[in-house]
Amino acid sequence: MDYKDIATPTRTKALLNQYGFNFKKSLGQNFLIDVNIIHNIIDASDIDEQTGIIEVGPGMGSLTEQLAKSAKKVMAFEIDQRLIPVLKDTMRPYDNVTVINEDILKADIAHYITEHLTDCEKIMVVANLPYYITTPILLNLMQQKLPIDGYVVMMQKEVGERLNAQVGTKAYGSLSIVAQYYTETSKVLTVPKSVFLPPPNVDSIVVKLMKRPTPIVDIDDENKFFKMTKAAFSQRRKTINNNYQSLFVNGKVNKEKILEWLEAAGIDPRRRGETLSIKEFANLYNELQNFTELEF
């Protein structure tokens, strides 16, 4: 029997009725019902028959189905147990799809890649990410040093703009720095609310993040570097000096030391965090080695 694509209002509604499925707001469930949007996502992903895909939050399989037609293998993580029988049904025609009923934030992703995707020449994360945990998912995947070549992911427009933001813009912040430290970022397309069931409260964006061969700057302790950059944006209207001063209010550090540190790195203490490029933050971090009393 021929079925319509899952990513159509007719088929999605039929599946909802068939399984008596009710959306869980707590899981941020919004199913894509526009095949053209999905084709745009797949085109941006440069998928071929040697590509392995990691998908997060497949739902009923609207994106999964189209990925399975283009990629060598698809490994989809779905946290909602209620969707597992639905996916078993909708993915039956595709023997290259593996559905894993786990929370992506708790799963041993390296193990699953070894188990399912080792024969793939390239690995991409392609997903309509759950909006309530988009940032933790991306940071978790990037910071694990997994053999992932890139990401083409849909998310809340505001978050996507922060990932892709340039220095000096309103959206630029600590998330921009982490994303651009590991990847080259670009916007693929803006997605209206109307192509989801149910429609979300916000507009969406598809962002492409391709892994850099090496990070954009040379840092010896990434966690400490990211803590330092995050602190610079703790209160956006404050200067970088004031934000760093507020970290050391216990009095153990002489305020003059922070000024010395900023000036040694060539950073005007009156600047705000959003005006510093990643390279300037790297210079600031590397200068920390000479100021051991400043501990992040």
From Swiss-Prot:
Origin species: Staphylococcus saprophyticus subsp. saprophyticus (strain ATCC 15305 / DSM 20229 / NCIMB 8711 / NCTC 7292 / S-41)
Keyword Cell wall biogenesis/degradation: no
GO cellular component labels: cytosol
Coiled coil residues, start to end: none
Function summary: Specifically dimethylates two adjacent adenosines (A1518 and A1519) in the loop of a conserved hairpin near the 3'-end of 16S rRNA in the 30S particle. May play a critical role in biogenesis of 30S subunits.
Protein name: Ribosomal RNA small subunit methyltransferase A
Subcellular location: Cytoplasm
Cited Pfam families: RrnaAD
GO molecular function, one term: 16S rRNA (adenine(1518)-N(6)/adenine(1519)-N(6))-dimethyltransferase activity
Binding-site residues for S-adenosyl-L-methionine, renumbered to this chain: N30, L32, G57, E78, D103, N128
